A protein has these predicted regions:
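Nucleotidyltransferase catalytic core that binds NTPs
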Residues: 1-263
């Protein structure tokens, strides 16, 4: 029901806690320091957990951020729940259940673009810090001007509307398959005319790199894990948390099929 409310545009977002209770973001996140990570999580992998745990450590280092006032949220957008224009309700519920089983709150929203989500959360947070954890390749997308063609002021308008609030982006590195090196905030490749903007944001404490991470996990990609599951390979189990692996096998999620035991 809650998902349908978002789907029909009656509400812009809804949340589920670890007990699968439906929450109203305006109440659950009121005056909270909010740490948000966005993605498909199909399925949630070890690298996702490393990202959120080390992103949280960086978030907790900020001034005036206290443990009791922090809400960690995994967000799924409606676009990430569609296939051929149709909402995959069961697929969403499966992903929400997996994240909830790990102890995280799940949000589903209509906000595809990051600045729109920050605009939505800012009045709820009431001056508290909003942290957004992004993989470095997603940060590349934020710095693509074509992403903001619908705004009269383009990229600068979006950045003003998003970063003008009390918010910060925490950037998680990636493995560069082309050269085998770690790709991070220090060697990110963006358009030359936007390098100054990136430096401005770094100088004004709007972007921070996540320095603690497990480099052995950076090769894990959700799409690759999903392909392994569907292909019947067993190596995917090494890429997900143990509880997630057990749930995928028990409930036969994401195309997993139990192997028949021959007698």
């Amino acid at each position: 029901i809650a998902l349908n409310l978002v789907k029909r545009g009656i509400t812009d977002s809804t949340m589920f806690d670890l007990s699968k209770n439906v929450l109203q973001p305006t109440t659950a996140l009121y005056k909270k320091n909010i740490l948000l990570t966005r993605g498909r999580f199909r399925p949630v992998t070890k690298v996702h957990i490393d990202m959120i745990e080390n992103g949280r450590k960086a978030f907790m280092e900020e001034n005036d951020v206290k443990e009791e006032d922090v809400s960690v949220v995994f967000e799924l957008t409606l676009k990430d729940l569609t296939a051929d224009g149709k909402i995959l309700v069961q697929d969403f519920l499966d992903r929400a259940d997996l994240l909830s089983s790990l102890g995280y709150t799940v949000m589903v929203s209509n906000y595809l673009k990051h600045y729109k989500m920050v605009e939505y959360l800012a009045p709820i947070a009431r001056g508290k810090l909003i942290g957004v954890i992004l993989g470095v390749y997603n940060l590349n997308t934020i710095f693509e001007e074509k992403y903001y063609g619908n705004l009269p002021g383009g990229l600068l308008e979006a950045f003003g509307r998003g970063f003008g609030h009390h918010m910060k982006i925490y950037v998680y590195p990636a493995f560069n398959v082309e050269d085998g090196e770690i790709y991070d905030l220090n060697n990110i490749e963006i358009a030359p005319n936007l390098v100054g903007l990136l430096n401005y944001m770094r100088d004004n404490d709007k972007i921070k790199e996540i320095k603690e991470f497990n480099p052995k996990l950076l090769h894990i990609m959700s799409d690759d894990v999903l392909s392994k599951i569907k292909a019947g390979a067993s190596s995917w189990e090494e890429d997900v948390p143990e509880s997630v692996g057990k749930a995928i096998k028990f409930y036969e999620l994401f195309g997993y099929q139990k192997k028949e035991i021959k007698v």
